[in-house]
């Protein structure tokens, strides 16, 4: 299986399955000299880990990361950083009934068609459990970006099913299990999710993630556009079916006079473009939205086929998230951070000596 590595200079390779012995990652290309320990990664992992809320999967994993290489005397050496998280709460017997059947709208069928063989336990490699290693790698990227360049990345839940959330207080996003920017909406979210779980159904969600203080100049024209790589990074997350940069699909209804981000000596007057112009960062906030589908692992019977092509009825057992978007915020932050650090290192490698006489204007006046 190829396709397990992301990045050009800052490369992240992940490995492992949902019910395997462990998950792992190799982070290659990390700059040397960064103070780094497991605690730097554990905060983000604790935000993502399962079993922390009644509204997410009840699989309980400590997700304690071990740094195996690439750090000496508390600092990165510039060599590959090896990361491992052991799986400790697998319950593979829950999946025996799908060994020869396919859950509708799941990766079961396509993995079988591609490889002729699949690890059906918890979805194997297609499980969102894989994203734990992205979060660990992303925490390294986030620390470097903040320490060296003041770049900060903040995500939050912007919609759960029909409930759209206002951005009232971003400081409380990490203090509630929904990553809600509106503390007043939490009772409504809890009531909705409780009813959904009783129904045995699932629902989709929308996550917004913003990168602040990104310098202008990251990205390249045509095939290495910053927004194109952001879209690829976000689309690689399990269950993501749509990505928007800035105003996204809303631009269809806008006129040029509305959409253009006019400039003054004091700064940009708007940020409809989401911080990227011509595939290159403008110095404004990079604003990304992602839409996650409802998980197909539900207890409501659904039609499907078995490996012989016979019609069957599927009821998914096991422990699953009724809304995968609830735990997706740290994953989105990680993938945006990994993309930005990779482009920053690439930009520095080619353009470190570039001198531009045009002043850098503020992100927004």
Curated annotation (Swiss-Prot):
Pathway where this protein functions: Metabolic intermediate biosynthesis; chorismate biosynthesis; chorismate from D-erythrose 4-phosphate and phosphoenolpyruvate: step 7/7
Positions with a binding annotation for FMN: 125-127, 238-239, 278, 293-297, 319
Coiled coil (residue ranges): none
Cofactor: FMNH2
Entries under InterPro entries matching the protein: Chorismate_synth, Chorismate_synth_AroC_sf, Chorismate_synthase_CS
Uppermost EC category: lyase
GO terms, biological process: amino acid biosynthetic process; aromatic amino acid family biosynthetic process; chorismate biosynthetic process
Catalysed reaction, written as an equation: 5-O-(1-carboxyvinyl)-3-phosphoshikimate = chorismate + phosphate
GO cellular component, one term: cytosol
UniProt similarity note: Belongs to the chorismate synthase family.
Name of the protein this chain belongs to: Chorismate synthase
């Amino acid at each position: 299986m190829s396709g397990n590595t992301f990045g050009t200079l800052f490369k992240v390779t992940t490995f492992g399955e949902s019910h395997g012995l462990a998950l792992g990652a190799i982070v290659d290309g990390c700059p040397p000299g960064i103070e780094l320990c497991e605690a730097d990664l554990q905060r983000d992992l604790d935000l993502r880990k399962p079993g922390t809320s009644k509204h997410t999967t009840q699989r309980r994993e400590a997700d304690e990361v071990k740094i195996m290489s690439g750090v000496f005397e508390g600092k990165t050496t510039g060599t590959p950083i090896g990361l491992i998280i052991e799986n400790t709460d697998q319950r593979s017997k829950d999946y025996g009934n799908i060994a020869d059947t396919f859950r509708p709208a799941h990766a079961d069928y396509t993995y079988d068609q591609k490889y002729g063989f699949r690890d059906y336990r918890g979805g194997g490699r297609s499980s969102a459990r894989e994203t734990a290693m992205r979060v660990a790698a992303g925490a390294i990227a986030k620390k470097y970006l903040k320490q060296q360049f003041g770049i900060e990345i903040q995500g939050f839940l912007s919609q759960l099913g029909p409930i759209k959330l206002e951005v009232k207080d971003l400081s409380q996003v990490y203090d509630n299990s929904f990553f809600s920017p509106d503390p007043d909406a939490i009772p409504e979210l809890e009531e909705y999710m409780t009813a959904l779980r009783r129904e045995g159904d699932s629902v989709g969600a929308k996550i917004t993630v913003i990168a602040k203080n990104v310098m202008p100049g990251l990205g390249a024209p045509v095939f290495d556009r910053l927004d194109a790589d952001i879209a690829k990074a976000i689309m690689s997350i399990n269950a993501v079916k749509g990505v928007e940069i800035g105003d996204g699909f809303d631009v269809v209804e806008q006129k040029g006079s509305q959409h253009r981000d006019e400039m003054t000596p004091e700064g940009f007057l708007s940020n409809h473009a989401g911080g990227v112009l011509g595939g290159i960062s403008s110095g404004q906030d990079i604003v990304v939205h992602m839409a996650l589908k409802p998980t197909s692992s539900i207890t409501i019977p659904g039609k499907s086929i078995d490996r012989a092509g016979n019609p069957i009825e599927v009821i998914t057992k096991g422990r699953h998230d009724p809304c995968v978007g609830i735990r997706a915020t740290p994953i989105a932050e990680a993938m945006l951070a990994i993309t930005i650090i990779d482009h920053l290192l690439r930009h520095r490698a080619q353009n470190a000596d570039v001198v531009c006489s045009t002043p850098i204007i503020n992100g927004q006046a």
